[in-house]
Amino acid sequence: MPRNYFFRLAVFAVCCGVFAAAETAPREQGILPITTKSAPARQLFVGGLVKLQNLHGPEALQDFHKAIQLDPDFALANIMISFESVDAAVDPAEKVAARERANAAKSKVSRGEQLVVDWLTNSSEGRMVPAIQSMNEVLEQYPKDKFLAWLGAVWVENQQQITRAIPMFEREVALNPDFAPPLNELAYCYARTRNFDKAFTTMQRYITLLPNESNPQDSYAEILRMAGRFDEALVHYRASLKIDPGFVYSQLGIADTYALKGDEPRARAEYALAILHASSKTEVATWGLQSAITYVREQDFAGADAAFRAVASQAHENDLAVPEAEAYRFMASYQTDGAKALDLLKKAEAVLQEKHSLPKSTQQQELAVVLRERVARAAHDGNNELANATLKQLHELADSTHNQVVQIAYDGAAGAALVEQGKYDEALTHLAEDNRNPISVNFMVRAYQKTGDKAHADELSQLLANWNEPTLEQALVAAELHAHTNESARSFMRM
């Protein structure tokens, strides 16, 4: 299923065999103990893990909630609900409350479980150094636990360290060849590094292991779409829905595919159908943003403004800070009036500074990309004072959080500013750290062209022409690639 919309709580599914056993597994087995006072709670937990393994998130969360009702001190069940990742099914306030319950129960569980709670809590609250320390300690204590090995690999992947995650997933697959979840993530990692041959081979193994589940078909469809094979992707999305008509993420995938194909009215109709079956207000807002991006693809910026403002208004009513801030940030990205763009970015930052039940790391990461946008806009408009001041603010945020996502935002911002200053070699060093962002890759093309490196410029231009991920950044770059002559509708990012 799409990594951008659904959460990675399936990481805990790897431990379902462990949790079905005794309350605490022997330390000498190298397996993480599990503590709960309720056998029915454990059964619900295990059932939820199986559902998460197959990415049936809302149903899994129902099981976890029932487990917590039976045992409020069930630390791992609580920390699962709070796990800070790309989670469209759990509202921010619920994550915070679940994390607090997990920490309140720490004194009643094993040392290993305490380390897992510390690891995920510190990560969620933006304290990356102690998070890594807890992760390393628990992985060292339980080297045979495939749950922890899997969780570590997914956590690294979530930090945007794809090349580091690949060997971790490969090791997990080698140790447990019949265990499906690592194959899913490994295939995505291969696809994101443009190794589609390995991605397709790995995904075929995943489908073979789970022939009656929707998610393998959904994941295969997304990777086909990433490779530009849109019609084949639609076939597999529909195969997923045939297996489970309620697997709404495949409906979302159909919408994303039509958006990338250029059929924006059809995409909006498909997004509306997905939104109709969304399981949370967060999903409604996030998918509303995706639908609004279709107007950017059509260069109907008035339509985009209206759609983004509608999402921002609804998100504000529902106390969803990140989608509201994203809506303002997205609007800023295509404005031709620099003052208007900066005003929208100021609104986005103000939303994030308000009091919300929001994990600290989530707030920091969204703030980082808002600041990144401000640096790029100011640098492009020749406002070097604002660009430098904002870049300093972003650098301090990266240094204080040790958050890889924030660091990548800083490198993207620094690279953009340096390109505008004509410091191309220095810019390329920073931009290479943000090479999963089409806008940064586009800046790299400019830098290579300016330095006379036509081979690298052409290689990256070809990469951008085949960049098939349904993001705003991709839409902006695609508009530049396909509409160079439409000066009146040019975004400042499309240059």
Regions inferred by a protein language model and the residue ranges of each:
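Alpha-helical segment of the N-proximal tetratricopeptide repeat
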Residues: 37-66, 70, 114-133, 137, ...
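Structural marker of alpha-solenoid helical repeat scaffolds
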Residues: 70, 105-108, 141-142, 175, ...
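Canonical positions in the second alpha-helix
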Residues: 66-67, 101-105, 137-138, 171-172, ...
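Residue-level recognition of tetratricopeptide repeat
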Residues: 40, 74, 145-146, 179, ...
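Canonical tetratricopeptide repeat
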Residues: 80, 151-152, 185, 219, ...
